[in-house]
UniProtKB/Swiss-Prot annotation:
<keyword id="KW-0547">Nucleotide-binding</keyword>
<dbReference type="InterPro" id="IPR001348">
    <property type="entry name" value="ATP_PRibTrfase_HisG"/>
</dbReference>
<dbReference type="GO" id="GO:0005737">
    <property type="term" value="C:cytoplasm"/>
</dbReference>
<keyword id="KW-0328">Glycosyltransferase</keyword>
<dbReference type="GO" id="GO:0000105">
    <property type="term" value="P:L-histidine biosynthetic process"/>
</dbReference>
<comment type="pathway">
    <text>Amino-acid biosynthesis; L-histidine biosynthesis; L-histidine from 5-phospho-alpha-D-ribose 1-diphosphate: step 1/9.</text>
</comment>
<comment type="similarity">
    <text>Belongs to the ATP phosphoribosyltransferase family. Short subfamily.</text>
</comment>
<dbReference type="InterPro" id="IPR018198">
    <property type="entry name" value="ATP_PRibTrfase_CS"/>
</dbReference>
<dbReference type="GO" id="GO:0003879">
    <property type="term" value="F:ATP phosphoribosyltransferase activity"/>
</dbReference>
<dbReference type="Pfam" id="PF01634">
    <property type="entry name" value="HisG"/>
</dbReference>
<keyword id="KW-0808">Transferase</keyword>
<dbReference type="GO" id="GO:0005524">
    <property type="term" value="F:ATP binding"/>
</dbReference>
<dbReference type="InterPro" id="IPR013820">
    <property type="entry name" value="ATP_PRibTrfase_cat"/>
</dbReference>
<keyword id="KW-0963">Cytoplasm</keyword>
<comment type="subunit">
    <text>Heteromultimer composed of HisG and HisZ subunits.</text>
</comment>
<keyword id="KW-0368">Histidine biosynthesis</keyword>
<dbReference type="InterPro" id="IPR024893">
    <property type="entry name" value="ATP_PRibTrfase_HisG_short"/>
</dbReference>
Length: 210
């Protein structure tokens, strides 16, 4: 039996992903060690899990290093990889927003600078609005940018909004809501179709309360 490999995101969504797979009866015994290893092999059921950075999950899946993956919709929209998005997993709820100091709301000028970890999402959003902006790509601590004058606003993912409030920023506009999605490598969907569809079915039953 061919091994099916699944890329799980390290960080805030790991626990929810593990709970979902366990509820679906997928590799229960192996997943209890998820916090200690980067690769977990369930030889009995021919399933291999790997823990990777959330931003890297689509790359692993697109290139076939993983057959399936769990990834936020925000990352999928940013990267636009060549893969299948097959299931909304209904966890990891957050919002992609434009945020900035409160006074920016009243003077939303053109030619503004936008700091973000999601340059493609930001560029597409402002282009649709017909607004001319300069995109500044950052890799972390995006909230700092308006405070130190690097940008007028930011585009970032928000869960509770607490980090924004702590830095004196407010949500100006919501771009889209985001949840975790199940993604599949296109070749794997053909070569391992039966096994992958079985996993999708089990997960869907749990999500739908079956």
């Amino acid at each position: 039996m061919d091994i099916v490999s699944i890329a799980l995101p390290k960080g805030r969504m790991t626990e929810d992903a593990v709970v979902l797979f366990k509820k679906a009866g997928i590799s229960n015994d192996v997943l209890k060690d998820i916090s200690r290893k980067l690769i977990l092999e369930d030889n009995k059921n021919a399933i291999k899990f790997m823990l990777v950075k959330p931003m890297d999950v689509p790359t692993y899946v697109e290139h076939g290093a993983a057959d399936l993956g769990v990834c936020g919709k925000d990352i999928l929209l940013e990267q636009k990889k060549d893969l299948y998005e097959v299931l909304d997993l209904k966890f990891g709820f957050c919002r992609m927003v434009v945020a900035g100091p409160p006074n920016v709301k009243d003077s939303f000028l053109t030619n503004k600078r936008v700091a973000t970890k999601f340059p493609n999402v930001a560029e597409e959003f402002f282009k649709k609005k017909g607004e001319n902006v300069e995109i500044i790509k950052l890799n972390g601590s995006v909230e700092l940018a308006p405070i130190v004058g690097l940008s007028e606003v930011i585009v970032d993912i928000v869960e509770t909004g607490r980090t924004l409030r702590e830095n004196g920023l407010v949500v100006i506009e919501e771009i889209f809501p985001s949840t975790a999605r199940l993604i599949v490598n296109k070749a794997s969907m053909k070569t391992k179709s039966e096994r992958i569809k079985d996993i999708i079915l089990k997960l869907r039953e749990v999500i739908n309360g079956g």
